[in-house]
Amino acid sequence: MISSSAREDIVQWRVPVAIRIGYGPIELVQGPAEACRYLADRWPFLGGTYHDLAESGCRAAMSRRASVEEARSVFISAAQEACLLD
């Protein structure tokens, strides 16, 4: 049996989102579970309109309550808000 956290990691985006935190290398975020980890642990600041929407959207996509691509779109908006896109 696959655990719920393993199932959450199976949900992937068709196209990963490339972000850069600070002066670090470009990192590819593959799906909503990974995006949630970035939003919670690696984001330059917590809060913000799109940060909060991305967190809830990614959680909803992981539990199949929302579209995976909608979660990707709001994650991209959060990355733009945090100046993480090149």
Name each model feature, range by range.
Residues P16-L53:
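A short, structured beta-strand/loop element
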Residues L53-D86:
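Short, compact, well-ordered microdomains
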Residues S5, I21-Y23, A79:
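Generic secondary-structure microfeatures
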Residues R7-D9, V29, D52, C58:
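Homeobox/homeodomain signature
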